[in-house]
């Protein structure tokens, strides 16, 4: 029975282009997971979009003398294009400035407020001393009063996991200009997190399948749970849906509150765009559906504590949650099943920093290198379990010594020889025990790699796939069919047949990781259709007449299945080309020189 799998991907912020460190944390792992489950025949809904509200966007707009909407429009397109070119197979990649998102966000706010889970409190708001604008909590840094970490943020300390307010920090400073923020009394709305403390503690304690860092960080956060501000004094954001704020532009819903709601609103938008307006309920109110959230480690508690609290408070109510007389009447929205958090990627030993030039944007990278080469590196050497460093030397080494030399070499030597000598899948003779052993080992990879992917252990899964490819290379080197063909044509045909079957199975195994090259290989092997076909952009017209673009794809047409090879004898091959490009080591110095020029 196919499962309903929600793949909820962190929303990239639309105040600039995204760099490779961003997609290492949320994009590539989520896409690998989604593609695997589609191949398994499960019903996948992968959603996200650009996060377009808040002070950072207004700061860029002020600097350029334009509007926040213009900035959001620009970077929504740039980011969408980057994710398309990287092959991230969203069912819907949308944005938070749609009428649908506003409606869903306001419905959740209103419902939580009516149920007493949103309260009013007077607090000290942080404002920039130079611009007078509200400073988001994450734009304020200082020393943690509990552990002494000197880069604690205004909402939490990433070192000890404590929940903080900007006023808690010792020597707070603005990340915008380095100046101390100005604190002024102001009234805000707060999500009453302590009201959910017991439920959250019991629920998190039951999540034995979570990564230890996610579970421990979340439990630690619960120790000092307090109400969380969900509004800010600014003009750019989702309006507060209460009568007294109908004509006020000085206070809006805080960007973090509406961003996490985006997972739900994007699912609802997908259903509307597909002509099945209630289809989203199959993922959100189906007790058998499973939700997987992908993000960097700095967003853990938003997905393990704050968003679950909002879901618990909303339950089955509100305009969207209610399904009177329907299949899901009275069934609450589902909580996360797993929160897959990645660590941080650094670059040449330093933190990514756009302002300091320590960065390479996705579009810049893909203008010179293949998407699958980047996807390979970010998976095999990425920050899955610990902070890792991207260096150009390591990227070139991994590409040449692993991707090209192992998997690329196996495909090239097999297909080029078979195409030259047979033109189609050859008729094998009797299989020897050695033939059967290598076939069985690769066939077993469907299960072993699949289990690792299902557990979100992407690095181990890719390493196992590469190990299997290496085993087939060893088999060919030992059997030497290019020599055997001179004296025993049938035996050579058998060896190449076995190699083709292994390559065909490995093609499926590599597809979630390397979709572009896997699709080309699929075609070289004589197949038609898509196992990892093209994505597409669609223009969507909202009820208010506005249009926006969504990244999506017709994934139901994909023909791949997570199964061993069924490559038929006699299938005509297409002329193959090498799957990957070997990189000249001179690119290392060229790229380091580019980075140095950005540093000035």
Curated annotation (Swiss-Prot):
Its EC number is 6.1.1.10. GO terms for biological process: methionyl-tRNA aminoacylation. Keywords: Aminoacyl-tRNA synthetase, ATP-binding, Cytoplasm, Ligase, Metal-binding, Nucleotide-binding, Protein biosynthesis, Zinc. ATP binds at residue 354. It holds the Pfam family Anticodon_3. Its cofactor is Zn(2+). It is found in: Cytoplasm. Its main location: cytoplasm. Zn(2+) binds at residues 144, 147, 157, 160. GO terms for molecular function: ATP binding; metal ion binding; methionine-tRNA ligase activity. InterPro entries: Anticodon_Met, Met-tRNA_ligase_1, Met-tRNA_synth, Methionyl/Leucyl_tRNA_Synth, MetRS_core, MetRS_Zn, Rossmann-like_a/b/a_fold, tRNAsynth_Ia_anticodon-bd. It catalyses: tRNA(Met) + L-methionine + ATP = L-methionyl-tRNA(Met) + AMP + diphosphate. Binds 1 zinc ion per subunit. The keyword Ligase applies. A motif ('KMSKS' region) lies at residues 351-355. A motif ('HIGH' region) lies at residues 12-22. GO terms for cellular component: cytosol. Monomer. Belongs to the class-I aminoacyl-tRNA synthetase family. MetG type 1 subfamily. NCBIfam families: metG. Is required not only for elongation of protein synthesis but also for the initiation of all mRNA translation through initiator tRNA(fMet) aminoacylation. This is Methionine--tRNA ligase. It comes from Chloroflexus aggregans (strain MD-66 / DSM 9485). The gene is metG.
